[in-house]
Curated annotation (Swiss-Prot):
Post-translational modification: Autophosphorylated.
Region forming the signal peptide: none
Gene coding for it: rio1
Domain of life of the source: Archaea
The keyword Ion transport is assigned to this record: no
Region (Disordered): 1-22
Protein name: RIO-type serine/threonine-protein kinase Rio1
EC id: 2.7.11.1, 3.6.1.-
Organism: Haloferax volcanii (strain ATCC 29605 / DSM 3757 / JCM 8879 / NBRC 14742 / NCIMB 2012 / VKM B-1768 / DS2)
InterPro entries attached to this UniProt entry: Kinase-like_dom_sf (IPR011009), Prot_kinase_dom (IPR000719), RIO-type_Ser/Thr_kinase (IPR051272), RIO1_kinase (IPR054876), RIO_dom (IPR018934), RIO_kinase (IPR000687), RIO_kinase_CS (IPR018935), Tyr_kinase_AS (IPR008266)
This protein's UniProt keywords: ATP-binding, Hydrolase, Kinase, Magnesium, Manganese, Metal-binding, Nucleotide-binding, Phosphoprotein, Serine/threonine-protein kinase, Transferase
Residues annotated as the enzyme's active site: 218, 235
Residue numbers binding Mg(2+): 223, 235
UniProt feature, compositional bias: Acidic residues: 11-22
Swiss-Prot/TrEMBL cofactor(s): Mg(2+); Mn(2+)
Length: 290
């Protein structure tokens, strides 16, 4: 396998079985800070609300969201905010300066704007959320913590994803791949050079993710980015375990989407063969396209 697209390797000493620790979705420190509303937090909240990049978000950021950011600043994960990177239906992503002077991405899910039913479709059936309730705030918190846990698991399995750094309530801090002035590009935005090689890297990442017990669930050229010749898988919030009742359906859809894109780019790719490659025995190394 070529390293032309910067394939990473699995972390040593990691083995994956069927063990899944339940993810706690109860109130965290950010909720307690928001309830206390001490003077330091109030002053921080007002400064943040007055910042230009947050003025348009005052109607959707509740006190607990500001408290989550406050706690992440206290813990040294965020030193200063930059501008917005992207604005989506459910979350906004901001550039920020991390505690080690590295650029980080801060993904803030908006409780009131998130698609509650869409999230529940991916959470129900996940063994990590067997006792998830119906409160909208709790569902969004579960979604964010699931994204953080999925990123950690994918990284250990040798899948190139943004490195997860910290999570508080509905706020996720992770590695920023590229910077605003030199941002990473979605594959949908570029003409892929050497599409066969790129396809082989992506399908290997899909197989590693599956062996780690996860299915991305929404993989396509819109959730694959490239920066400095490196392919990165993003948006793992909806990724489900292989035990999810819809895992096979999601995986087959991922395989079709990925294969169709790379075939249009000129690669020898087929959805059914990709599915066989991803789900094949660990000892197999077939090319999946014959």
């Amino acid at each position: 396998m070529t390293d032309e697209f910067g394939m990473v390797e699995p972390q040593e000493g990691e083995a994956f079985g069927d063990e899944w620790e339940e993810i706690d979705v109860s109130d965290d420190e950010a909720d307690r800070i928001a309830r206390r509303k001490d003077r330091d937090f109030d002053e921080f909240r007002m400064r943040l609300k007055d910042a230009d990049q947050f003025k348009v978000e005052q109607s959707v950021f509740d006190d607990a969201t500001f408290a989550a950011i406050y706690k992440l600043v206290q813990d040294g994960h965020i030193d200063a905010f930059g501008g917005p990177i992207s604005t989506g239906k459910e979350a906004n992503v901001f550039e920020a300066l991390g505690g080690d002077d590295a650029d980080v991405a801060v993904k803030i899910y908006r409780i009131n704007a998130s698609d509650f039913r869409h999230m529940r479709d991916y959470l129900e059936g996940d063994p990590r959320f067997e006792n998830i309730g119906h409160d909208k705030g709790q569902v969004v918190r579960a979604w964010v913590r699931k994204e953080f846990a999925n990123l950690e698991r994918a990284q250990r399995a040798g899948v190139r994803v943004p490195k997860p750094i910290a999570v508080q309530r509905n706020v996720l801090v992770m590695e920023l791949v590229g910077v605003v002035d030199d941002r990473a590009r979605r594959l949908s935005e570029v003409r892929v050079e050497n599409p066969q090689t790129a396809y082989e890297v992506v399908r290997e990442y899909m197989r590693r993710l599956h062996r780690a017990g996860l299915v991305h669930g929404d993989l396509s050229e819109y959730n694959l980015i490239i920066h400095d010749g490196e392919l990165v898988v993003i948006d793992l919030g909806q990724a489900v375990t292989v035990h999810h009742p819809n895992a096979e359906e999601f995986l087959r859809r991922d395989c079709r989407n990925v294969a169709n894109f790379f075939r249009r780019q000129g690669a020898d790719a087929d959805g059914d063969s990709l599915y066989e490659f991803v789900t094949g025995d660990e000892g197999e190394d077939g090319d999946g396209d014959e």
